[in-house]
Amino acid sequence: MNIRITGHQISLTAAIKRYVTRKLIRLNRKFNHQMNFSCVLEVNKLSKKVEVTTHLPGKDIHVQVENKDMYTAIDLLVAKIDRQIVKYKELHLINMHSAKISD
């Protein structure tokens, strides 16, 4: 697994990097293949924004969340990307099964 974390207008502390890495590793454990994540943390005047992009076979998933608290934004983002990956996996399995049945 490869995780690239960058910050815009924020100094990335070891605690934030560790927190993001730990959350994304949990996502990787759920799925069978190697995943690469690109994470951008950004601080605006009133809110914190977190973006993650990952590449799956046949699809790129991009998720963006804004919140007042950085750690809450990370938690919300991980929940969102988890739902999108599960949806992708379910559709991928349905397509695989329908292809086998039609043969």
Where are these regions (language model features)?
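N-terminal, polar/charged subdomain of small-to-medium soluble alpha/beta proteins
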Residues: 1-103
